[in-house]
């Protein structure tokens, strides 16, 4: 401030010959402002890039939807899909197509009125053989059920699918293409019927006593035109 009152000048080597007061005024006139950084044209996203990003997002969305659709259980089929499914079932059966003529019999011994001859398959005898054969893989389980339910009732207490499995093993060793087969007292349930026809062979006729016509298994075979009552 003393320099300003005396009117002294700043030496030239310091960059100006103006009085200090005037230098302050001149400097105040030249203020600096912060400016936003300039964007070169190349840094801005082009329309092509935006379109590519949009298409990529759409593709991801479609894949996600398709993935969810595949996880949903399929509960309806077109006619061609249903036929393909049936062909697949026939291919995995032990005796696919019409290799065997199989008659199921339930609650009657008069089946010979409808079918004569043929190989007789008795599930009870098959199960008993497995139960009484030492070292058989099913011996222990069958004997547990036998001891718990008795010699008669234990046949009806087998785990779901076991009777079909044992009948299938027997037929694999004792039946061949072109045979007529009569299975006694089988099937007793729609589950057994469905499993047998999928895994072993189709049933041509289901022969039953008149008194059993109103049971679920009889209604099942009646609906497909395979029920015969005697």
From Swiss-Prot:
Membrane topology note: Single-pass membrane protein
Q: Which domain of life is it from?
A: Eukaryota
Q: Which UniProt keywords apply?
A: Membrane, Mitochondrion, Transit peptide, Transmembrane, Transmembrane helix
Quote a single Gene Ontology cellular component term.
mitochondrial membrane
Which region of this protein is its transit peptide? 1-33
Primary localisation category = mitochondrion
Give compartment(s). Answer: Mitochondrion membrane
Residue ranges of the TM segments: 50-68
> Family per UniProt?
Belongs to the AIM36 family.
Stated name of the protein: Altered inheritance of mitochondria protein 36, mitochondrial
């Amino acid at each position: 401030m003393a320099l300003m009152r005396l009117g002294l000048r700043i030496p030239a080597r310091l960059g100006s010959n103006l009085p200090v007061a005037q230098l302050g005024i001149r400097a105040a006139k030249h203020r600096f402002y912060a400016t936003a950084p300039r964007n070169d044209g190349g840094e801005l996203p082009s329309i092509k890039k935006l379109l590519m990003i949009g298409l990529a997002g759409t593709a991801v969305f479609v894949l996600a939807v398709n993935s969810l659709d595949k996880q949903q259980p399929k509960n309806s089929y077109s006619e061609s899909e249903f036929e393909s499914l049936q062909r697949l079932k026939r291919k995995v059966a032990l005796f696919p197509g019409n290799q065997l003529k199989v008659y199921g019999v339930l609650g009657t011994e008069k089946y010979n009125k409808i079918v004569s001859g043929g190989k007789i398959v008795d599930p009870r005898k098959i199960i008993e053989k497995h139960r009484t054969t030492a070292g058989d893989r099913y011996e222990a389980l069958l004997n547990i059920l036998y001891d718990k339910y008795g010699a008669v009732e234990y046949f009806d207490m087998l785990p779901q699918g076991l009777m079909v499995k044992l009948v299938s093993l027997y037929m694999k060793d004792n039946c061949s293409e072109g045979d007529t087969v009569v299975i006694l007292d089988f099937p007793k349930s729609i589950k057994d019927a469905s499993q047998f026809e999928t895994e072993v062979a189709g049933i041509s006729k289901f022969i039953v006593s008149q008194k059993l016509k109103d049971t679920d298994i009889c209604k099942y075979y009646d609906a497909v035109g395979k029920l015969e009552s005697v």
